[in-house]
Amino acid sequence: MATRRGVLKLVGGGCVLAAVGAGGFVAANGPSRSARTPWREAGQETEFRRRALSYAILAPNPHNRQPWLVRLDGDDALTLYCDLDRRLPATDPYDRQIVIGHGAFLELLALAAAKDGYGTEITLFPDGEDMATLDARPVASVRFVPGGAEPDPLFAHVLARRSNKELYEARDVEAEKLATMMQAGSDFGVSATTIGNTPMAETLRDLTWRAHQMEMNTPATNQESVDLMRIGAKEVAANPDGIELEGAFIAVGKLIGMVNRETLADQTSAGFQQGLDMYEALAMSARG
């Protein structure tokens, strides 16, 4: 039986399997097979909105909280809400990250719908919004328009998405690839650019690392993250949300008592310091 955290809950009844996030920390052998089921079964729903939703739930989102509720409206529409119990009051008090996650959800929904030839008319905050935080009002309403879109080449890469948690190579990205990314990033009325390996890149690496230090060294934000960690394959399979810690290194660390919620919350522990060292190396290897 699927747990609450294993499904996308549809308001009014029904569900679509939800997914363990690719954005969490994955070490060595990757996530549990059962938690990856929605990635393998995406696109198998027969009803077109549910089929699009089976891809949308794979969207990256903060701490992999999967903070969405969906109501199917009539035969050609749906309404997206935020599951307010899945916000991050310490880490994300103004719901900025949660809103970005909903944006990713809507973009994947549109890409998946376009694959089936449906356009999507998306209205953000149709009943208004509280500028300070999310509330019970809808985040978006979506109407599907038959024949209203052509498939987007980006859709082919949806299931290959991952969040890199390894050191970046010390080389520049090829100019052709950068140009392609800048073009894709400029298609929505914004300007995308790159900075290369310049002093600005060094400044951004430093800001990234110092921001991570601040979040980790603030007890409330660190504890919120620790509480959402799924340590080892059994925990990931039981609750395929949150921040997954898996792999051979994690398994050994858990066995010898180095990797557990107590040590990860203890700023004086070796496990806590190793986590900081790992993220510093990641941040400082990033390229512009």
Regions found by a protein language model. Give the residues of each.
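Acidic, surface-exposed loops and disordered segments
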Residues: 2-288
